[in-house]
Amino acid sequence: MVHFIFVTGGVVSSLGKGLTAASLAMLLQAKGFRVSVRKLDPYLNIDPGTMNPHEHGEVYVTDDGAETDLDLGHYERFTGVSACKFDSITTGAIYSKLLKDERLGNYAGVTVQVIPHVTNIIKDFILSNTKGVDFIICEIGGTVGDIEGLPFFEAIRQIGNQLKSENCLFIHLTLLPYVKTARELKIKPTQHSVKALRAIGISPNILVCRAERNISKGEIDKISLLCNIESEYVVPAIDQKNIYLVPIAYHNSGLDNKVLKFFNINIMPSKLDKWHDIINRLKDSNSKVRIAIIAKYHKLKDAYKSVIEALDHAGIYYKYKIDLVWINAENLTEENINKKLLDIDGILVPGGFGERATKGKIIAIKYARTNNIPFFGICFGMQLATIEIAQNLIGIKDAVTEEFKVDGTKIIEKINKNCEDSKITIENVKKTMRLGSYPCSLVAGTIAANAYKSLEINERHRHRYKFNNEFQNIFEKHGIVFSGFSKDEEIVEIIELPLLRWFVGVQFHPEFKSKPFEAHPLFIQFIKAAIEYNKCN
């Protein structure tokens, strides 16, 4: 029988529900259990694929092409289990299905309502695709009390009644704010959060309390008394310097064992060797390397969450701290770039869409190429690298991308040439996008092949434009190596400048497949080149 665990949050958003769910999943895995983690988001968008990063942060792409919440990235990185389209749902997707079914007459003429019709769809999502797992952990987005989240809370309340405590556990994450003038953690917000949760029929079984400092036994006992939860099931969640310290912190607080005890499951020893190795490597990371990220959303780090984590994974691999320098691409010019990129050991241009800030990114790519600084271009970053090379090395001064330039030499073109711009709407945008995992063939003896130690790989994609193959010969005459292609050889996947220290651009998103215990080979090689550059300078 599958055991269901629901992770909810209160007091404030962004408390770390995703990290809590991912950490618990990993800890249960370490005891030999098979775990699946899912995210239920209450917003009305069908998925985050067309949402502004300022609204949502990174769009995380799964192997099967689902555009999902960045929390699924945490789930994958912590557990090593690939997520899929069945691991994420939104209110928008639920209502889309409901209204389609209503128009098809599937409700047989009854009045369609939130209860039971919306809640039934939510319950079906939670209770389906359970084969081969022991635990399903469901993170409910938002906080208790949010009006848009009520159908989700009602659905999990019903599941709780249906499955009883033998197979259903509620974990509630709250904040204990520290008031410096009073020199104490305040419990009142947690009381109100638990009260609000109980008001909709859910009594938390485990209360996880986020705080910036240690929670005393007296404070835990007080929380237990006022929230009517046994003190044993009040779990501290103290701020950590690095997110990869969180799972072991939860293990040390006994969260995994408390879950097993609640379900009356025999407590087994945990195999946490690889996580202790990560912690030791983090402790031993005394040297640092400075990486500049040339970004459009330089103030919103969550827009590049997986890139940041993938860089950290490579840092863990080499026992180096990654010192990220965020550069606003919009303000980068030929005049200030020397000052902006002073003492930088590597330059990374991440993926993105749209014309804004592209000029600064191209200037940064030229700076990396002409100064032989390790460079890594991802997706749009690779496309801009080919434009920079065309303009400044080959001499095609009017080189452009078809994404936002009609006039000029189109170095970057649409994948689907039959799709007119007027047809690219929210309704059919996915039809024009190359999404999910695709195979890629590498050329032997190249930087990419040596990094992967294989000639056949699979990587995740999210793009609708590609390199124009008509220019392959002229690029090759100027020293550019095309080292990776799609299976049909229609799409250039990787470019290299082998005469430089390390200059690589990829059409895919390698950051989505990097793990703290298995850093991605391209990020490993990029950081290796940056470390060597640092030592030489």
UniProtKB/Swiss-Prot annotation:
The active site is at residues 379, 509, 511. It holds the Pfam family GATase. ATP binds at residues 14-19, 71. SUPFAM superfamilies: Class I glutamine amidotransferase-like (SSF52317), P-loop containing nucleoside triphosphate hydrolases (SSF52540). One of its GO terms (cellular component) is cytoplasm. GO terms for biological process: 'de novo' CTP biosynthetic process; pyrimidine nucleobase biosynthetic process. Residues 290-536 form the Glutamine amidotransferase type-1 domain. CTP binds at residues 13, 146-148, 222. Keywords: ATP-binding, Glutamine amidotransferase, Ligase, Magnesium, Metal-binding, Nucleotide-binding, Pyrimidine biosynthesis. The keyword Magnesium applies. UTP binds at residues 13, 222. One of its GO terms (molecular function) is CTP synthase activity. Catalyzes the ATP-dependent amination of UTP to CTP with either L-glutamine or ammonia as the source of nitrogen. Regulates intracellular CTP levels through interactions with the four ribonucleotide triphosphates. Homotetramer. This is CTP synthase. It comes from Rickettsia peacockii (strain Rustic).
